[in-house]
Amino acid sequence: MIKKILRKIGMDGCVCNLPSGFHASVVLVEKEGWQKVVKIISKDCLRTKKSARLLAEDIVAYYQALKNIGVITPENDIRIIKNGQRYDLVIISPFCGHNVSSRIRSGTEKECLDTISSILAIVKRFFLHPVSSDSSELVCGLDPKPDNFTLDRAGQMHYVDLMPPRYRKDGRAIVEFPPPSSPAGYDLAYFRHFDSRGILLVLRTQLCRIRHDLRPQILELLTDFSRGFNNPCLKDYFDDFPGERFISAGPSERKEIIERLGDEDIYLIRDIATQVACENPLHFDRGWIEDIFHLTHFYDDVPAAENIKEIKKKLSAALKPR
């Protein structure tokens, strides 16, 4: 299907699959000296050309909003293609390097931390534009996972995730596409994409997910970054965050923190898991962390109660002396 779409738009060069996310299939096309990234967004809800056009307009509006706040992101050429009973969006952009997840995962400590610093330089552009001077909520949203940042040959970092287009449309933030069906799902998505506290928490857990062995250094870097903003909301949140207490807590306090975990404590759960793996790398490897992240995955609503129950069992077992 991808090759058929590429032929339809006249891009039938050498095709290489790139890591794809939830919303799009992504390929790199090379032909006659140029390289283009092609993202194909195929959604069942795009049944009419009007719905596809509205989504394309939102992506363009988000791109412009990012440029307005100084975020470096590649230009996009958007095409709408008929595909059976629905319409697909095809987004063509210049190749700006591979995403930095593998660089963080396999690089030296210096390479890893330098890469994170470059990510934070982009995140800073978002944080410098809150909805008001004393708010932790931002004008533009983002998904700060390392998969959404690329490093080009000149060493320039780019933010490349324009789908969903996380900007404020008619006074309401677009957090996902399609939007979560429950208020709890919307609120969680808003917190992780439009609130500086949630964005830093997502970045913290995602980075430590990849490099739990460098967790102390990563936390130090993020703490220094957050202190650069005169925002009491941000400071107070992490001062009171139970994940910080867990680091230095004794066995009984750690047990109490785990027992109190609820279905909205997704990022606290993930944070605790990466701390446990950092302390006990021989017993709790990346596979164990991935199990926890999988059990805490959510979209329309908070994770199921049985998932939280299983997580608490796993974390409680991890606290037992070895």
Residue ranges, per PLM feature:
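Juxta-kinase regulatory segment immediately upstream of eukaryotic protein kinase catalytic domains
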Residues: 1-13
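ATP-binding glycine-rich loop module of kinase domains
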Residues: 12-63
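Short, flexible/disordered intra-domain loops and linkers
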Residues: 41-54, 103-110, 172-175
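Conserved structural core of kinase catalytic domains
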Residues: 64, 70-121
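Conserved kinase catalytic-core segment
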Residues: 114-142, 146-149
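Catalytic activation segment of kinase domains across protein kinase-like and atypical kinase folds
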Residues: 135-209
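Helical subdomain adjoining the active site within ATP-dependent kinase catalytic cores
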Residues: 198-322
